[in-house]
């Protein structure tokens, strides 16, 4: 347990007391829950290690200031020294007292570290025997401005030695040893029933005297909460019980895990990480207590419209009680230096409080998912499953767990100590979960009253049925047990141990890998004998491990050791078999899924191969068609091979040839007509003598114009008629290719023959023959081009007719003016 902080005065070391070494060392100083190091001058003698603010042998202080002794340690021969090189830490361990003492100092250099180690070992070898030293309180006093006032110690000494409400281990926080609800559980149920509609519940404080009175009434027999009670008083009772737990509801290593999980940016990933941290790092009793508190808080926040307590408000009230190590400075917060001045420490403390509130808020908002989680929902209410408690329990003369001294040299300080700032120098209880300055305030163990049988919870635990310890800790075994020593246990002691937890590891997160159990072979003959035996031998531990007492001499049973080891190995074997079977089942499912995937891919590959083959065939066919069309366009109809393309393609080529011949003939006819018109116009302009001849010219010109228009329309009608008749000629084209088509003539309208169009027969026949024997190849694009050309010719014809009419009008106006000028004067 942590050494008493009561202030005492020590005399200066006498001349007869040899000084083994003197020099500077660093001690820890507490302020605002944060640890820092201060340099002090230490003097080591055979009986004590005292320290001063400055070197006492130096010059007198300014202004006549007296350099008094600030504190010290009483030495005895049972002490040992542990060195940690990486942080230059020096720890003095004493197994004497109820739970042992541990004092941590820090050297400036490694040379100083080993010099102090050698000097301490020499002094401890010459120190008085522990059994002969009077008043083994192990006082290690610190400066008054950095410690809790001595009034706390006197207040603590006046507390009852044992309470059924406060100061109980986390294992018994929610239920009594017989399975009935505890004070805390009943208070939580009351708040869930009657406190959800009370405004400011958990935030508004009640009178301290009423809270103390209600706790005393419960201890005196009033074990039920009535609906008439003040919910604010009950809420403060819950806070009071949590505040006075011997250890934090959430251990330091678990706080660190929650803090790391909360740093994740994505909300979903952060929630999953928080759940995993609770499942993997929390001991079973701590997890049950945290989930129970979250359930009550979630119920309160679900009625926030009535009580005005949101998740953030409830988290602000309860996070300092649940995440005690985080606010005590045991978790590494990046970007904040706890060794700075008061303002830096205030900022660090505020940041820690904000992080704690944010973590609890996130847990409250995700409470529904966590309850539905298989790992979190599997919380047994049996005391046999509560083996993972990280907090200390009331020491007992019958519970004996030995952590041998050689192992202490290989142990590390708790995981939460990430730097020198978090190493605690003050002596403390080895099982203490945090450096919370007031934690000693809530430890209701007797001081110096070790011979009282009423101080042991043995009588309470005797009502629990004795069970095999391996069955209770099987879920916490993660590594093989390396060294187990078990001796026979008396019925009373076995009954007591069955309801207890055992954590021999240094940190709450360390697996149970080195358990050493020894118990007394016989009951104490008397209270005095049991007390003297306990005082003579004590176990020592380092950091956060539980410090328990050594067994009586000569009480080892190798058969029990082998039996327990065999049982645990069998359990591990069964668990490994189950894991192997589970993995094999999962692998079989994955293998089946892989086979299905392979089959689907094979079928898909075959389908794609078929599609590729079909598309290649289509591509080849299109290429062949393109080649045939290109060949057809490059040769004449007579040279076109019948094997190069089908009948449809040949018909299109012939039709295109006819259309091109018609267009060429029309162009020639238009050119001839235009030339004739120009000649006639010039002739008439030069040969008109008078108005009568001019009138005759206009009449003849109009007649010729009409004849020209009729001829042009006849030509276009002939072309259209030819296009309509080409459909009928399809059946005759086979005969034309065999040579029989030369004797046939295309039927036509009697009005649309060569004579009616004014075309000589010798000119018309070659055109027709050319159209029937020299048909170039064609495509759909060529047909569209032909249609476009015909439309263009129509538009061109209209333009020419308009030009001819304009010329006629101009010619008429000029002739009229000439006629008026040549008229006789009498007109």
Swiss-Prot record:
Residues 517-543 have a biased composition (Polar residues). GO terms for cellular component: cytoplasm; plasma membrane. It comes from the Eukaryota. Residues 413-423 have a biased composition (Acidic residues). SMART domains: PH (SM00233), RhoGAP (SM00324). The keyword Transmembrane helix does not apply. Residues 401-412 have a biased composition (Basic and acidic residues). Residues 379-437, 517-561 are annotated as: Disordered. SUPFAM superfamilies: GTPase activation domain, GAP, PH domain-like. The keyword Transferase does not apply. One of its GO terms (molecular function) is GTPase activator activity. The record marks 203 as: Arginine finger. Residues 560-684 form a coiled coil. Residues 172-371 form the Rho-GAP domain. Residues 18-125 form the PH domain. Acts as a GTPase activator for the Rac-type GTPase by converting it to an inactive GDP-bound state. This is Rho GTPase-activating protein 6. It comes from Arabidopsis thaliana (Mouse-ear cress). The lineage of its organism: Eukaryota, Viridiplantae, Streptophyta, Embryophyta, Tracheophyta. The gene is ROPGAP6.
């Amino acid at each position: 347990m942590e050494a008493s902080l009561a202030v005492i005065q020590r005399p200066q070391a006498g001349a007869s007391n040899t000084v083994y070494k003197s020099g500077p060392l660093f001690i820890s100083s507490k302020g605002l829950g944060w640890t820092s190091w201060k340099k002090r001058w230490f003097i080591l003698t055979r009986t004590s290690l005292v320290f001063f603010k400055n070197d006492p042998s130096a010059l007198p202080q300014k202004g006549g200031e007296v350099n008094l002794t600030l504190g010290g340690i009483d030495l005895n021969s049972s002490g040992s020294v542990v060195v940690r090189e990486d942080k230059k830490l020096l720890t003095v361990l004493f197994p004497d007292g109820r739970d042992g003492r541990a004092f941590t100092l820090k050297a400036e250099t490694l040379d100083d570290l080993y010099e102090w180690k050698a000097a301490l070992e020499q002094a401890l070898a010459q120190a008085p025997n522990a059994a002969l030293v009077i008043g083994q309180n192990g006082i290690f006093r610190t400066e008054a401005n950095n410690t809790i006032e001595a009034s706390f110690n006197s207040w603590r000494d006046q507390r009852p030695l044992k309470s059924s409400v406060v100061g109980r281990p986390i294992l018994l926080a929610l239920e009594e040893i017989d399975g009935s609800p505890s004070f805390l559980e009943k208070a939580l149920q009351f708040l869930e029933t009657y406190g959800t509609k009370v405004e400011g519940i958990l935030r508004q404080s009640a009178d301290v005297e009423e809270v103390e009175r209600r706790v005393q009434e419960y201890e005196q027999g009033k074990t039920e909460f009535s609906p008439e009670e003040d919910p604010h008083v009950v809420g403060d009772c819950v806070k009071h019980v949590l505040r006075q737990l011997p250890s934090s509801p959430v251990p330091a290593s678990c706080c660190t895990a929650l803090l790391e999980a909360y740093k994740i940016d994505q909300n979903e990933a952060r929630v999953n990480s928080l759940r995993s941290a609770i499942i993997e790092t929390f001991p079973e009793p701590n997890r049950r207590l945290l989930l129970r508190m979250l359930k009550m808080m979630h119920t309160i926040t679900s009625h926030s419209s009535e009580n005005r307590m949101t998740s953030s408000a409830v988290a602000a009230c309860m996070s300092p009680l649940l995440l005690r190590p985080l606010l005590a400075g045991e978790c590494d917060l990046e970007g904040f230096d706890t060794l700075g001045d008061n303002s830096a420490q205030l900022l660090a403390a505020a940041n820690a409080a904000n992080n704690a509130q944010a973590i609890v808020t996130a847990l409250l908002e995700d409470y529904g998912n966590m309850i539905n989680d298989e790992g979190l929902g599997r919380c047994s209410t049996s005391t046999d499953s509560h083996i993972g408690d990280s907090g200390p329990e009331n020491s007992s003369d019958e519970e004996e767990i030995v952590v041998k001294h050689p192992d202490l040299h290989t142990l590390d300080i708790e995981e939460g100590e990430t730097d020198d700032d978090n190493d605690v120098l003050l002596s403390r209880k080895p099982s203490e979960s945090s450096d919370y300055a007031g934690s000693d305030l809530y430890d209701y163990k007797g001081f110096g009253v070790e011979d009282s049988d009423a101080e042991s919870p043995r009588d309470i635990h005797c009502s629990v049925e004795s069970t095999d310890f391996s069955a209770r800790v099987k879920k916490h075994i993660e590594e093989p047990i390396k060294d187990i020593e078990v001796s026979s246990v008396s019925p009373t002691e076995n009954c007591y141990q069955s309801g207890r937890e055992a954590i021999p590891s240094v940190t709450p997160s360390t697996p149970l890998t080195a358990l050493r159990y020894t118990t007394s072979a016989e009951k104490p003959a008397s209270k005095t004998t049991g007390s003297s035996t306990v005082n003579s031998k004590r176990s020592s531990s380092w950091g956060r491990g539980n410090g328990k007492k050594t067994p009586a001499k000569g009480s080892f049973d190798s058969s029990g050791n082998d039996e327990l080891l065999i049982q645990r190995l069998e359990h591990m074997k069964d668990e490994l078999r189950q894991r192997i079977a589970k993995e094999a089942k999962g692998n079989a499912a994955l293998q089946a899924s892989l086979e299905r995937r392979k089959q689907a891919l094979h079928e898909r590959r075959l389908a794609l191969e078929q599609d590729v083959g079909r598309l290649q065939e289509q591509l080849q066919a299109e290429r062949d068609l393109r080649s045939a069309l290109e060949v057809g366009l490059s040769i004449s109809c007579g040279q076109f091979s019948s094997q190069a393309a089908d009948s449809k393609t040949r018909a299109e080529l012939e039709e295109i040839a006819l259309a091109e011949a018609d267009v060429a003939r029309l162009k020639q006819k238009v050119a001839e007509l235009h030339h004739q018109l120009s000649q006639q116009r010039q002739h008439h302009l030069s040969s008109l003598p008078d108005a009568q001849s001019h009138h005759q010219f206009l009449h003849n010109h109009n007649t010729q114009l009409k004849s020209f228009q009729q001829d042009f329309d006849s030509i276009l009608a002939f072309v259209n008629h030819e296009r309509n008749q080409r459909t009928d000629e399809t059946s005759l084209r086979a005969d034309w290719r065999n040579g029989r088509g030369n004797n046939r003539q295309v039927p036509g309208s009697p009005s649309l023959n060569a004579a009616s169009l004014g075309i000589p027969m010798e000119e018309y026949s070659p055109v027709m023959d050319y159209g029937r024997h020299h048909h170039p190849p064609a495509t759909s694009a060529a047909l569209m081009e032909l249609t476009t050309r015909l439309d263009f010719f129509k538009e061109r014809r209209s333009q020419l007719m308009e030009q001819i009419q304009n010329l006629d009008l101009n010619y008429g106006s000029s002739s009229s003016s000439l006629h008026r000028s040549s008229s006789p004067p009498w007109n």
